[in-house]
């Protein structure tokens, strides 16, 4: 069987779906709910393509080729529908890609990462991160107006984290060796998509006050899975800088469920693609139906989940910590 993709004739191999044919031919087709050699069901519509013969827009991850198809993967109409699909997914994705404190730091310091290392008792690493930005023991905070503390989400709950005091504490620890393992990364690239989680409800504020136990008081807003997040990657490629629609998800923000070992699950970041459900035996499952549907992990099923499952998650909802 031969079909045409972007005016190029391609012979179809037995059992291939459109997305597999297109990718084998070198065409880039994004996808969120599809992973090669994994069980899946089409739901995201990010992989949509157009059959110019019928005029139909079809999900390429679950559609099998038919003789005579003429497929478009990169037309303006296809790109527009993919962008809309991404924006709808983002309305269900309640999370920060980057911590506000890091985004506003005038020195380019990854403030949230430093606080994470500090709270984990990894003071040498935290000081090494500072050394990549400041000529220790001197720091640039004395003349700074502390935009990091003004942007701190903890400040909307009760009191902002005393970031400058922690920086000065670490800078003064001359007993801690500095390793050249960090470099400054500008996280303020205006072309990169940045998700925002929105405002905390009063109930969430009370819950955060009660459950946040980090020595610094930091809520650790930055997403632990942002480096491998397809949602952020494709949103950036589509030219989406900020979500068009308000976040409609009411799942508890910052709820982190320990699955097992190094694996964690954050329901508020989940787009309900189902990959973790379809590819775990008596593990993750769906709860409820329609707009209220959620992906959950029953307590008694946690031991059945394999760590490789985290690699299937297209967002930072399911991830491994170092």
Predicted regions and their residues:
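Ferredoxin-type iron-sulfur electron-transfer modules and their immediate structural context
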Residues: 1-312, 316-320
